[in-house]
């Protein structure tokens, strides 16, 4: 299991119980030496999920890995009964990848955290 191997920073260790319980799925594209090149995850609830954490190492970009990870996440979620799948993005280049995979804009969202109040 890849998640068992990725424990250096403690991130996977802290979510391992969630993964093992089937509440979160992480999919990764690995280099032959086991290095994660691209990853993504989803955490379904009541037939709905957001795809998140989709990213590719800079040295592994332009190989279709983000698209492959996204497609694998969608297929995995659909196979498990998830009917509504959404995601958010911040860059137009990423939006084009998602559009090619069948995602369409639904609305705009602005999320701001830890910002000082403006007068």
Model-derived features with residue positions:
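Conserved GNAT acetyl-CoA-binding A-motif
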Residues: 77-90
């Amino acid at each position: 299991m890849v998640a068992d191997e990725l424990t250096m920073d403690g991130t996977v260790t802290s979510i391992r119980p969630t993964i093992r319980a089937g509440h979160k799925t992480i999919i990764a594209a690995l280099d032959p030496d086991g290095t994660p090149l691209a990853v993504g995850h989803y955490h379904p609830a009541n037939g709905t999920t957001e795809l998140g954490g989709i990213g590719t190492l800079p040295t592994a970009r332009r190989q279709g890995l983000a698209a492959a990870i996204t497609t694998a996440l969608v297929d995995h979620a659909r196979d498990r009964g998830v009917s509504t799948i959404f995601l958010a993005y911040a860059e137009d280049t990423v939006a084009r990848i998602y559009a090619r995979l069948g995602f369409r804009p639904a609305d705009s969202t602005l999320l701001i955290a830890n910002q000082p109040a403006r007068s």
